[in-house]
Swiss-Prot record:
Keywords: Amino-acid biosynthesis, Branched-chain amino acid biosynthesis, Isoleucine biosynthesis, Lyase, Mitochondrion, Pyridoxal phosphate, Repeat, Transit peptide
Name of encoding gene: ILV1
PANTHER family membership: THREONINE DEHYDRATASE, MITOCHONDRIAL, THREONINE DEHYDRATASE, MITOCHONDRIAL-RELATED
Catalysed reactions listed for this entry: L-threonine = 2-oxobutanoate + NH4(+)
Start-end of Polar residues biased regions: 1-19
Enzyme class: lyase
Record's subunit section: Homotetramer.
Cofactor: pyridoxal 5'-phosphate
Naturally occurring in which organism (per UniProt): Blastobotrys adeninivorans (Yeast)
Compartment list: Mitochondrion
GO BP term, pick one: threonine catabolic process
Entry protein name: Threonine dehydratase, mitochondrial
Length: 550
C-alpha cells in the first residue's frame, strides 16, 4: 500500500531556508573539546555507519592520470546502497537517537539523496520515517523513498513551503528532524570517508582531496578528520559558478544567502550553508574551485570512461574541479602528486544523458562552436569547409542575411561546430585562418544562449519592432508555463518562443516579446513578479546575426 499523501507544492532547489540553530546538546561531554565544540576525531572514529554502509573502494583513474600527468584516484561513494554518501550521515545521526525518542519517528525535508538515506536508515533501525517533498517532485524520486518504507508527504510549491510543513509536522508529532548537513553526527558520518581514504591511499603521496560542496557537510566531515591526521593534505572544495555559497561565504567571513542557485548540479544547489559546517570549513578548507555546467558534463564522461558508471552532476563536481585545478596550475609538478576526487552520488535522471552527452565535448575542449559570416556566392561554403578540414564537422547550419540573391553583396551566417584535439590551443589559430580568408568569425563555445537554442534561431524572419529576447528557466510542474503565457498575452505580443526540456526539474524557454519603450517599466514589473530566473539576450551577438541579419 502506498505511503504517499498529496496536499500541494514548486521548484526543487534543496537548501536550508531556516538554518538549524541547535548546538551540541545531544553530544555527550566526553565527545566535546575544552571549548565546548565537538571533538570530530572521536565522533568520526566512533561512528556507527558500518551497520549499513560499505567501505567504498578507491579506483585508480588510469585515463585521467595519463591525460593530466598525475596520479588520480576516485573514491566510489556512488557504490553505497542508496548510491550516495548521504547514507553515512543520516544513519549515524539516527543510530545515536535515544530509544525514548525513536518510537515517535523521524522526519526530513528532501527530494534527493538525503531522503533515500533517511528512509533506508529508518528501515534498518525500525524507526518510522516521514519525508516531505515539494508537490512537483518527479515520481521516480518519491516512489524510491516510498519503496524504502517511508511515508512521503508532498506539500508546497518550493522547498521553503516544504520545509515549513516539515517543521510543523515535527513540532506537532514530536518527530526528530534529520537535517541535510548541519548536525555534528551527520558531519561525523560523512567524515568516515576520510578515515577510509587514509587507509586506502599512501598518505605521503596524497597531495589533495577534491570534494563537492552543497551545504558543506561532506567537506566539513572529511576535512575535520584529514586535518587532524594528515594536515599537509589539501582539502579543495568544488562548486558551480551559479551555486557558490561556500566561496562567497569564506571570502566574506560569514554565511551569505544566495538569491538564486543554478540547478544543473541539483544535489549541490544550496542557498545558505549550515552554521556548524561553515564553522568547520573556515578551519579546514584550503581552496575552492568553480566549474561550469559543460565542465561537469565532461567530468561525467571522464568517470564513465574510467568506471563504466554514470554519476549525477553533483557526483562529478569533484572530478571537474580536480581536472580544472591541475590544468590551471602548470607551474606545479603534478607527476609525483596523488589527487583524489570523491564521487558523491550516482542518482542520475536518465533523461538528462542527452544533454550531458551534447555538452561533454565542449567541457573537455574537444568541440568548438563558431559563427562565421561569409559572402553569399559560389565557392564560399567549400572554402569554409576547407579551413575546418580535416577536423570532423558535427553540426552545420546556415542563414542567408542581407542583400538580394541576384546581387553579389549578400552575406550568409553559418553556425558550425567541429571536433578539435585541444580547443584552447586550436581556436585562436582557426579564427586567424578564417580572418585571413576574409570571413568574420566568433567563437561561441561559452555562450549559453546558442548552446541551448541554436537550431531554433536558424531560418528566423526579419527583425520585429520592439522585440526583446529572454531566456527563462521554468520549474517542470503543471501551471508554470501557463502562468508565464497568461501574464504576457494580455499585454504584449509573443514574437518568438522555444521550449526545451533537459530531462531535469527545470526547463529552458527562449521567448521574444514585443515591448514598446513606453511600457518598459510595466514589463520589468511583470518580470519581477514572475519570480523565475531569466537573462535578457536582446544584445547577444548570435541573436543579432541569426534573427536580425545584422
Amino acid at each position: 500500500m502506498s505511503n504517499i499523501s498529496t496536499p500541494r507544492i514548486s521548484g526543487l532547489t534543496e537548501y536550508t531556508s531556516q538554518p538549524d540553530k541547535s548546538h551540541y546538546d545531544s553530544i555527550e561531554s566526553h565527545f566535546l573539546l575544552p571549548d565546548g565544540t565537538p571533538d570530530y576525531l572521536k565522533l568520526i572514529l566512533t561512528s556507527k555507519v558500518y551497520d549499513v554502509c560499505n567501505e567504498t573502494p578507491v579506483t585508480p583513474a588510469v585515463n585521467l592520470s595519463s591525460k593530466l600527468g598525475a596520479n588520480i584516484f576516485l573514491k566510489r561513494e556512488d557504490l553505497q546502497p542508496v548510491f550516495s554518501f548521504k547514507l553515512r550521515g543520516a544513519y549515524n545521526m539516527m543510530a545515536h537517537l535515544p530509544q525514548e525518542t525513536r518510537w515517535k519517528g523521524v522526519i526530513a525535508c528532501s527530494a534527493g539523496n538525503h531522503a533515500q538515506g533517511v528512509a533506508y536508515s529508518a528501515k534498518h533501525l525500525n524507526i518510522p520515517a516521514t519525508i516531505v517533498m515539494p508537490v512537483v517532485t518527479p515520481a521516480i524520486k518519491y516512489k524510491n523513498v516510498d519503496r524504502l518504507g517511508a511515508k512521503v508527504v508532498l506539500h508546497g510549491n518550493d522547498f521553503d513551503a516544504a520545509k515549513a510543513e516539515c517543521n510543523r509536522l515535527s513540532e506537532k508529532h514530536g518527530l526528530t528532524n534529520i537535517p541535510l548537513f548541519d548536525n555534528p553526527y551527520v558531519i561525523a558520518g560523512q567524515g568516515t570517508i576520510g578515515v577510509e581514504l587514509l587507509r586506502q591511499i599512501d598518505v605521503e603521496s596524497l597531495k589533495a582531496i577534491f570534494v563537492c560542496i552543497g551545504g558543506g557537510g561532506l567537506i566539513a566531515g572529511v576535512g575535520a578528520y584529514i586535518k587532524r591526521i594528515a594536515p599537509q593534505v589539501k582539502i579543495i572544495g568544488v562548486e558551480t559558478y551559479d551555486a557558490n555559497a561556500m566561496r562567497q561565504s569564506l571570502q566574506k567571513g560569514e554565511r551569505i544567502t544566495l538569491s538564486e542557485v543554478g540547478l544543473f548540479a541539483d544535489g549541490a544547489a544550496v542557498k545558505i550553508l549550515g552554521e556548524e559546517t561553515f564553522r568547520l570549513c573556515q578551519q579546514v578548507v584550503d581552496e575552492i574551485v568553480l566549474v561550469s555546467t559543460d565542465e561537469i558534463c565532461a567530468a561525467i564522461k571522464d568517470v564513465f570512461t574510467e568506471t563504466r558508471s554514470i554519476v549525477e552532476p553533483a557526483g562529478a563536481l569533484s572530478v571537474a574541479g580536480l581536472v580544472k585545478y591541475v590544468e590551471s596550475h602548470p607551474e606545479i609538478d603534478h607527476s609525483a602528486s596523488g589527487y583524489t576526487a570523491i564521487l558523491s552520488g550516482a542518482n542520475m535522471d536518465f533523461d538528462r544523458l542527452r544533454f550531458v552527452s551534447e555538452r561533454a565535448k565542449l567541457g573537455e575542449g574537444s568541440e568548438v562552436f563558431i559563427v562565421a559570416t561569409i559572402p553569399e556566392k559560389p565557392g564560399s561554403f567549400g572554402k569554409l569547409i576547407d579551413l575546418v578540414h580535416p577536423r570532423a564537422v558535427t553540426e552545420f547550419s546556415y542563414r542567408y542575411s542581407n542583400g538580394e540573391l541576384e546581387k553579389s553583396d549578400g552575406k550568409a551566417h553559418v553556425y558550425i561546430s567541429f571536433s578539435v584535439d585541444n580547443a584552447k590551443a586550436e581556436v585562436p589559430r582557426i579564427l586567424d585562418d578564417f580572418k585571413g580568408a576574409g570571413f568574420d568569425a566568433i567563437d561561441i563555445s561559452h555562450n549559453e544562449f546558442p548552446k541551448s537554442h541554436p537550431r531554433y534561431l536558424v531560418g528566423a524572419n526579419q527583425p520585429v519592432t520592439n522585440e526583446r529576447v529572454f531566456r527563462f528557466e521554468f520549474p517542470e510542474r503543471p501551471g508554470a508555463l501557463v502562468k508565464f503565457l497568461h501574464g504576457v498575452k494580455s499585454k504584449w505580443n509573443i514574437t518568438l518562443f522555444h521550449y526545451r526540456n533537459q530531462g531535469s526539474d527545470i526547463a529552458k524557454v527562449l521567448a521574444g516579446i514585443s515591448v514598446p519603450s513606453h511600457e518598459s517599466d510595466q514589463f520589468q514589473q511583470f518580470l519581477d513578479n514572475l519570480e523565475y530566473p531569466y537573462a535578457e539576450e536582446t544584445d547577444n551577438v548570435v541573436y543579432k546575426l541569426f534573427s536580425q541579419g545584422d
